[in-house]
C-alpha cells in the first residue's frame, strides 16, 4: 500500500 511506503520514507 502507498501508506506503507510513505511510512517507510518517514
Curated annotation (Swiss-Prot):
Which cellular component appears as one GO term in the record? Answer: extracellular region
Q: In which tissues is it expressed?
A: Expressed by the venom gland.
Disulphide-bridged cysteine pairs: none
Keyword Metal-binding in record: yes
GO BP annotations listed: defense response to bacterium; killing of cells of another organism
Top enzyme category: hydrolase
Cofactor note as given: Binds 1 Ca(2+) ion.
What this protein needs as a cofactor is:
Ca(2+)
Gene Ontology MF term list: metal ion binding; phospholipase A2 activity; toxin activity
Q: Which UniProt keywords apply?
A: Antibiotic, Antimicrobial, Calcium, Cytolysis, Hemolysis, Hemostasis impairing toxin, Hydrolase, Metal-binding, Platelet aggregation inhibiting toxin, Secreted, Toxin
Compartment(s): Secreted
Q: Known EC number(s)?
A: 3.1.1.4
* Top-level lineage group: Eukaryota
Q: Which reaction does it catalyse?
A: a 1,2-diacyl-sn-glycero-3-phosphocholine + H2O = a 1-acyl-sn-glycero-3-phosphocholine + a fatty acid + H(+)
UniProt miscellaneous comment? The determined pI of this protein is: 4.6.
Q: Which family does it belong to?
A: Belongs to the phospholipase A2 family. Group II subfamily.
Question: Function, please?
Answer: Snake venom phospholipase A2 (PLA2) that has antibacterial activity against S.aureus ATCC 25923 and ATCC 29213, acts by inducing bacterial membrane breakage. Displays a potent inhibitory effect on collagen-induced human platelet aggregation and has indirect hemolytic activity. Does not show cytotoxicity to murine skeletal muscle myoblasts. PLA2 catalyzes the calcium-dependent hydrolysis of the 2-acyl groups in 3-sn-phosphoglycerides.
Query: What is this protein called in UniProt?
Result: Acidic phospholipase A2 PnPLA2
Organism, as annotated = Porthidium nasutum (Hognosed pitviper)
